[in-house]
């Protein structure tokens, strides 16, 4: 048996597996995982692999047996516990397929806890394919070294989402119209509204007047400005997540908030 590797190099492959892991056990990989390791990475016996399970954390394993279409890994031990996930949801109207996939990938990288596609009056995106969106989330988490995956909710109508909105969760929504009034500072909103939060991003063309009224009527809603320029939906989503993570999340940038 090969010697147990030290902590894996940064170049070690890293994969999500949908099974609870523990040190001192073995795991068999086949399908897409095996194809990636065997055909793409050209992995060899004894090579290190990082695994995470979205349950307990990240583990170091090494290859003990190779087949044509599968391989066996021995799990040496845990390298990190599952991360504490900032309590931020992203509620976003679907846009063109590739750009919405990009939003999901980047929201995962930035650390959100939950992603909820929202159907609005002006939503023009194609039908949501949950399996493909989840695949984008997993790939993003593997690459950015997250140990937790966001929860992916089914497509929900805006009206239904607002009717069922949790009483203890702030809903920050981007409204480009309020910047000219001098109101809607995101920093001020973060100072005044600590606790569980969500960011609501509308479709290309924004929310309808009726939808704006419904959102503003929600006691937990907080209108915010993302600056003097009109942002595309995908840009707005990433900008808003970044501002929240800097002020209230785990970036520890605005420590005075």
Predicted regions and their residues:
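Structured adenosyl-cofactor binding patch, chiefly the S-adenosyl-L-methionine
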Residues: 209-257
